[in-house]
Amino acid sequence: KDIDEDGKIWTGINGTIYKITPTPQGQLEKSSISEQLTFWPGIYFKDMIAKENEVWIATHIGLFRYNKSNNTRKLYENNQNDPHSLSQNYLTNLAITDDKQLIAGTLRGANIYNPITDNFERLTHSSTSNSLLNSNFINCIRVDGQHIWFGTESGGINKLTPKRLVIHNYQHDKENPASLSDNPVNVIYEDKEGSLWVGTVEGGLNLKKQGTEQFIHYRWERGEISHNSVSSLVNDNQGRLWVGTWGGGINIMNPKAPNRPLQVIYTHPETGFPLFFIAVLVYDPTNNGMWIGANRGL
């Protein structure tokens, strides 16, 4: 991510987080940030987010807080004897609410950080009590003003309204063709019109227009996207929607006429850098480019 908003992407490579800079020759150069951002080979960096002078780093072994001013880091982990510790160590996604609260998604619910007590309040699903969430497997989090959207692996979309503590669940209903196309949700994106785009696993791309409760489906079978597993969504400075898929490359779409992609980007394995399996897309307004995280590299 462009943590410093200077056109240089923070990226984890072999256990260390570097800044990646595009050169005038079209190459990518990496530079060290701090010795505190060197961890160990094999660590999975799942997400990063800036909050004031700190950077929160989600991994598969816990949540790290890096203070840029003091050049220090701290690890937060699950403690079975502490209900205010992280609910689980495998982090999936991070988000900041409009009132500057940090939310951390895991494979066992969501966690809201309390800076006063330096611990967490948990949002989890339980079959034995009234739960705010209907699934603990959180894939992605999207903040939209007073609403927080959670994309889950098995429960579709959960919409949380914190002030009223209300959850609205959007799930696939085989009897309702205007419901969510499938329940495993990889990514949620809100465009400038307030419409919600939802990428699912094998269910294609979903569009929920602002003010409606119905989902429009875009699928590979109808030639609307190149693959039904949608893994990343972002727009560029021309208002186009970039749709990353896991197995079909990248689709560039016009949000006002999304029935056919404007362009599909992919490369074959023999090129040495296949662009079939896309994990993340990040638009870079400084360099007017798109950073592409694929299964074979950046």
Residue ranges and their predicted role:
Residues K1-L298:
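Carboxylate-rich, polar loop motifs that coordinate divalent cations or form catalytic acidic clusters
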